[in-house]
Each structure stands twice: as C-alpha cells, then as structure tokens.
C-alpha cells in the first residue's frame, strides 16, 4: 500500500457516526493524480497544470500542486468527492497552501466545499473557505460549515484562478464532523438621547449615564452612545471639550462598564499634541480602554473646525466576538465598513450625529455584519446582516435593545452565504483611479471655471 492509501485507510473512513478525513504525503497514481483526486476546469483551454510535487510539502513529501500554465484565462485545480456527509451536521475543513507569484491570494487561491445530494446534484451553494492565517511559508485556511438539507457528500475544491505565472501547493487537508457550535448570543443596547443646554461635557455625559440607568435593565454585553457625547448640548467648540484618552470621560464610562460588566462604546473628542480627533472609544467590562478609532472621513465642516482625520480601521477582539467602530460621515463611503468586515468585524458600532439610513442599510447588507447606530438626527437602532431592524429607539430617553446570534448564518436563496462569498470574491487588487483624474491627467476646467 502507498503512504496515501494507508493515510486514507486509517483516517479517511466515513462512518455512520461521523466523518474524519486526513490527506497528506500525496503520491501520484498511473494517471498522475492521487487516488480520489482529479483535475477540474470549466473548459480544456483554460485548465491549469496539476501535478503531485514531491519536493514542495509542509510535513511529509508530496503535495497537490497547481500551475497557472502561462495562461491568464486559467481557472481550476484539484477536486475530490468525499462521501458520508450527514445533512444538517457541522464540519470543520482545514488545509494549508503555499503560493508563489500569485498577485492577489485572497481571490486567486480558492478552497470551497461544494455540497452534493445522493444523486450528485448541488445541495445548496458551495461554501468558500475564507478564514486564513500565515504559518511560516504556508497559509492555513479553515471553515466551520453546516451541511445543507439533502447533502450526502461534499466535493473538496482547491483552485487557482487567472494567475499565469503562479504555482500553489496544497497540503495537510482535513475534514471533520464536529459538534454544533450552538448560538453565540450578544445583548446590545443603543441609546437615543440628545442633551441640551448642559453647558459642560460632564453634565452631558451625566445625562447619558442617567438615561442608561433608567432604560437599560438586565444584562448587556455592549452599550452604545452617540457621536460627540462631550460636545452635544454644551454650546462649546471641539477644542474646548477635547481630552486625552484615557481621560475624565473614559473614566466615567469605565465606571459604568465595570458596574454593569458590559462593554461601552461612545464618541468623544480626543486631544493628542496639537491634534484633535473625532474618536470613538471602546471600554471593556472591567472599565479599561479596550481601544479607540479616530474618524477617517471628516466632513468639510469638521476640518474647518480644526479636527484631524484618522488613518486606520482597527477591530477589537472582545469576549463575545469581533467589533469594529465607525463614526457618522464614514457611512457615506463604502471602504470603512468593508475594511472592518475584511478584518473580521461581526458587529459595527456606529456613533452618529446624522446620516443616510439607506447607505447604513447597504453597509450592513453588503458586508453581512450587524450594524448598531446611536444618533441625534439619525435613528437609533440595531440592524441585522440582512438590513432588517431588530430594535429601534424612536423616542428621546429610550434604548434600542436586542439579543443577536453571531453564529447565525444569513443565506441568500440563490447566492448562498454572501459573507463568505464576499470575502473571497472581493477584488481589492483592482485599484480605483484617483477622483477627478482621467487617464492620469488633471481634469480640464469646465462650466466657466
């Protein structure tokens, strides 16, 4: 028996109880492919070159290699059908790849789980394996996915797309039936309040804290307050209320977070050196500053008032999931929410003064994230990844409260899991031109200018 067949015999047996597959140390059979594996391409003229490479491997000699074959139209690679899938059961797929001369790995190196019925028809849409981490020269990709209704097998698809000079090697492939992860519930509260004639940042903050005490009862995981809670109602300029982080306002928010054992997010104005930022802070359950986000997209009015823009889209790994922050005018542009989603954000917390509800809904839908807003001239709500309002606080002095499930999958009837598809099909490698420039030239004056 070859090393491959021994591996399959010991580890790749599908039983009625569960499926556990391990494949590595690949050895080519007479047709050039390891047992069970075959080449797939949409058309012969766009097929890649596939081969077993005994020289490039991760743990034991022999990997599944795909070459772009000097063809810019190339798309395809290795496939293997695995029987013994149980409809409705959960499976964890893991594989490792090494890429050479691949311009954009995020969409050109593809792993998918293509679920099939007993008659080998598609049982729903394929699941893209989009989670990845570097491990030396190799990249680990993995996915936890639920087999659709009527699924009886799954085709493991390992592809290379439109990379004529590239080679990718796949190794250490596993598929395991695993326990249902169950719900991952997070309770969120978002506050609708607009203090007026407070004359001080401290008084405005006090009114927000008082409203939380009056409206938010029971356990919460995160509480969101609006943009600029230290300036609203005060009649003061940004520079007059700007403070350091940590500072007096984060200390008061920290007391709230600690007393409720809840994360708290809010917009304040931050001073660092000569710069003043429109900043959103995230306070952890112990009352410490977990992190901050400086508003990237400043409207002209804020620039003229002396604010400085930020330059990054951080995400924060909390004890319930991954959180991103946006502020107000950010919602008018696609890239803040997109950047947060590609970094793994599951919930975007958005302190906002006023903004476009339609664009906010688009940000949730296109990135398949929960979007939470707390605003003055913008509604206060909790929105799901389909853009549906789960809770809305319509009156001042009220709170929108909802419990969401971060493990819930939002599937499109025709397209499948759009979160996974977006992560793998997003073309960040195609650069947009600079606004106002045509073919690299400065635009001509027009309209009498």
Label the model's feature ranges.
Residues 7-17:
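Hydrophobic h-region of N-terminal signal peptides that target proteins for export
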Residues 15-187:
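Extracellular and organelle-lumenal recognition/adhesion modules and their flexible linkers in secreted
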Residues 245-264, 322, 328-405:
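CN hydrolase (nitrilase-like) catalytic-core segments centered on the catalytic cysteine
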């Amino acid at each position: 028996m070859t090393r491959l067949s021994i591996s399959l015999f010991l580890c790749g047996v599908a039983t009625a109880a569960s499926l556990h597959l391990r494949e590595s140390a690949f050895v080519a059979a007479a047709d050039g492919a390891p047992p069970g594996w075959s080449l797939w391409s949409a058309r012969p003229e766009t097929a890649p070159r596939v081969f077993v490479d005994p020289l490039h491997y991760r743990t034991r000699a022999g990997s599944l290699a795909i070459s772009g074959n000097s063809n810019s139209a190339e798309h395809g690679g290795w496939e293997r059908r695995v029987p013994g899938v149980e409809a409705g059961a959960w499976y964890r797929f893991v594989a490792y790849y090494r890429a050479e001369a691949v311009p954009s790995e995020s969409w050109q190196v593809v792993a998918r789980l293509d679920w099939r019925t007993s008659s080998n028809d598609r049982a729903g849409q394929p699941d893209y394996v989009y989670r990845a981490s570097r491990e030396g020269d190799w990249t680990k990709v993995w996915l936890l996915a639920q087999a659709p209704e009527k699924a009886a097998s799954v085709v493991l698809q390992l592809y290379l797309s439109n990379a004529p000079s590239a080679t990718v090697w796949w190794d250490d492939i596993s598929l395991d039936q695993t326990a249902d992860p169950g719900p991952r519930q997070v309770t969120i509260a978002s506050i609708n309040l607009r203090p007026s004639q407070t004359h001080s940042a401290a008084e405005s903050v006090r009114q927000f804290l008082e409203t939380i005490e009056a409206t938010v009862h029971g356990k919460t995981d995160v509480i969101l307050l609006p943009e600029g809670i230290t300036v609203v109602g005060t009649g003061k300029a940004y520079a007059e209320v700007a403070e350091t982080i940590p500072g007096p306002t984060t200390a008061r928010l920290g007391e709230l977070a600690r007393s409720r054992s809840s994360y708290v997010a809010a917009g304040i104005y931050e001073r660092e050196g000569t710069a003043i930022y429109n900043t959103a802070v995230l306070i952890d359950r112990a009352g410490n500053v977990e992190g901050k986000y400086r508003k990237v997209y400043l409207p002209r009015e804020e620039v003229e008032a002396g604010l400085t823009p930020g330059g990054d889209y951080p995400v924060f790994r909390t004890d319930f999931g991954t959180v991103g922050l946006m502020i107000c005018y950010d919602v008018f542009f696609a890239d803040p929410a997109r950047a947060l989603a590609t970094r793994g954000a599951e919930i975007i917390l958005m302190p906002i003064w006023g903004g476009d509800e339609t664009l906010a809904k688009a940000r949730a839908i296109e990135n398949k994230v929960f979007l939470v807003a707390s605003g003055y001239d913008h509604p206060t709500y909790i929105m799901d990844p389909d853009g549906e309002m789960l809770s809305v606080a319509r009156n001042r002095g009220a709170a929108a409260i909802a419990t969401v499930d971060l493990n819930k999958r939002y599937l499109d009837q025709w397209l499948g899991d759009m979160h996974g598809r977006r992560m793998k099909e997003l073309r960040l490698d195609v650069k947009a031109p600079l606004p106002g420039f045509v073919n690299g030239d400065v635009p001509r004056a027009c309209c009498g200018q």
